[in-house]
């Protein structure tokens, strides 16, 4: 339960750096407020035994400001803030958030895209991995106080879930589910 919410000034952050860009475009001086942030990885996890897509549900304060709930459904994901390859970071996030130990060579890159283009312009790289119970080493849930809930969505319900506006979800999840449904035969037959 979320309570005792208050807004305070952000004097310093390890995750964001607010900036104002000045530039000339067509001989006009313009300014744009933006936030420098880390890039990220996201992983679409397909549970081959249960025929489900694994997502995480967690509290996101900015979403709370909009809907007074704040819980979002997202792909397993993490920021790129370590001196490791993107696939190594994806590997760590799968283990930490969802509890599966997936061999690096079984985590396949799908594509990358820009997110939050109006204020951040970070790049998210999407991966896909098949998992099964033999790979499960923990219940997941994140590290420390992340309070991540692991949820499985049946493949049959994926399209309806994607379009359900009552559940806050990220564009990365929506794109990932759409990509999976378009490429289901290839992913499930590997």
Regions found by a protein language model. Give the residues of each.
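Acidic pyrophosphate-coordinating catalytic loop
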Residues: 10-13, 64, 113-124
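Internal catalytic-core helix/loop-beta-alpha segment
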Residues: 81-113
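Short conserved catalytic/interaction loops centered on acidic-Pro-aromatic/His motifs
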Residues: 102-110, 117-122, 136-140
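Short loop segments at secondary-structure junctions
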Residues: 26, 47-50, 59, 130-134, ...
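Conserved Nudix-box catalytic region and its N-terminal flanking loop in Nudix hydrolases
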Residues: 32-35, 44, 52-92, 136-137, ...
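Nudix hydrolase/Nudix homology domain
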Residues: 1-6, 69-73, 82, 109, ...
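Acidic, metal-coordinating catalytic segment for phosphate/diphosphate chemistry
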Residues: 8-50
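Active-site-adjacent beta-strand/loop module that shapes the phosphate/pyrophosphate-binding cleft
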Residues: 17-28, 116-136
């Amino acid at each position: 339960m979320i309570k005792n919410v208050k807004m305070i000034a952000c004097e310093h952050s390890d995750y964001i750096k607010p900036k104002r860009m000045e530039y000339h475009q067509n001989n006009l001086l313009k300014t744009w407020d933006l936030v420098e942030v880390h890039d990220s990885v996201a992983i679409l996890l397909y549970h081959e035994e249960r025929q489900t897509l694994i997502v995480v549900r967690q509290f996101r304060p900015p979403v709370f400001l909009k809907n007074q709930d704040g819980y979002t459904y997202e792909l397993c994901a993490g920021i790129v803030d370590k001196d490791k390859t993107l696939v190594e970071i994806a590997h760590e996030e799968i283990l930490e958030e969802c509890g599966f130990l997936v061999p690096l060579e079984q985590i396949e890159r799908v594509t990358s895209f820009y997110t939050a283009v109006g204020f951040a312009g970070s790049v998210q790289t999407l991966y896909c991995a098949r998992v099964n119970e033999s790979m499960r080493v923990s219940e997941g849930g994140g590290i420390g106080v992340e309070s991540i809930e692991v949820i499985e969505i049946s493949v049959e319900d994926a399209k309806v879930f994607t379009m359900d506006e009552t559940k806050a979800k990220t564009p990365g999840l929506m794109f990932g589910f759409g990509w999976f449904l378009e490429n289901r035969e290839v992913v499930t037959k590997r």
